[in-house]
Amino acid sequence: MIQTFSSTIRRKEMDAVLTCMVDEKIGPGELNARLIQTAKEFFSCAGAVALRTPAAALKYALKALSLEAGSGVMLSALAPFWQFLTVEELGYKPILLDVQPESAQVSAEAVSEGIQKGGRALVLRESLGILPDFEGILALGIPVIEDISQSAGGFVPLTELSASGAEGQSAQNAAAQKPAANEGSQEGDGASKAEVAGKKAGTFGIYTICSLEERDTITAGGGALLMAAGRRDWPVLKSLAEGISSIEMLPDINAALATVQIKEFSRNEARRKELFALYNRSIMAGKNKGFVRDVELNSTIWAFPLSLNGGFKDAKAYAQKKDIEIRLAFEDSVIAAKAEEFAAECKNAKALALRTAVFPLYPRLGRTQIEKISKVLVTLP
């Protein structure tokens, strides 16, 4: 059976983790600090904290915003359910936003409606690796916390941003708008990012969460990065970080894995894009469709999502007969957990939660496996 998800763990990752174990220093320490430095360079942020859970990252991001108790915090209906729970636990009011059916992203219009309902901050989930309308959303003047767990490495060329949109919400460091030469110069990634100036996913909001869980684009086996893109916003987060206990910090054994994953990102992403292009050609002859995205620059290839023409159960059974496991893309989302409560106001999200399947797409797939998946994409009912 070809599994839907598989972490890309090569010898470099294994060696890094084994070295950490041999040194008998697996708790938060030197490698946690090294991961932070690597993240600062890769994501072009002013500062970062490596934490044990994504929920902790969201908690400290919201604390850094200093929202009043009971304030409304807007979430995508397709955001992971832990975000809803975290917002409630902190004493804020979750306000769910519906998404656009063609991209699975919240729109500026949806955010505007959320503000009218009392939203005072937005956690911007960039689902499926697709980037939203940053310019339209930021123009509303609401504090934004980006969630780039699936969109890490995404990139918006300056040609697509107005002067105001390019500034984001804070004073970005200069590297955020330089050509992404470090990430784009490796073989197979194409010349696109190496030659085009722009802004990276994670540099548009005030703070950014990058979950490092097993099925995220970059994995540490668990944990999260919390980043501040701008120099003006980092001191607030830094002050909070100084009071964080070691039990909430990411252990070195996880940090070792994450550091290598970030350094190997371009190599892995180049392979994922090759597979995505191949799969995309396959679905052109089938009954089901993909999502609107710019594969070359704007989006990250987290997996291969497909909006099904029929029911998921039938598609799952068909794929299983061909020894391929597929899963619902949003099985852990807010709308999946709270369908009865929010179905009426989040109709698009509910439909996508029921009919969006993800197919196996990861670098270590073999030729025979890739051919099998491609054939199923063509013939899937």
Model-predicted regions and their roles:
Residues 33-36, 45-49, 121-125, 134, ...:
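PLP-dependent aminotransferase class I/II
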Residues 102-165, 173, 178-220, 226-232, ...:
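Active-site phosphate-binding strand-loop segment of PLP-dependent enzymes
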Residues 78, 92, 99, 126, ...:
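Histidine-centered beta-alpha loop that forms part of the nucleotide-sugar donor binding/catalytic region
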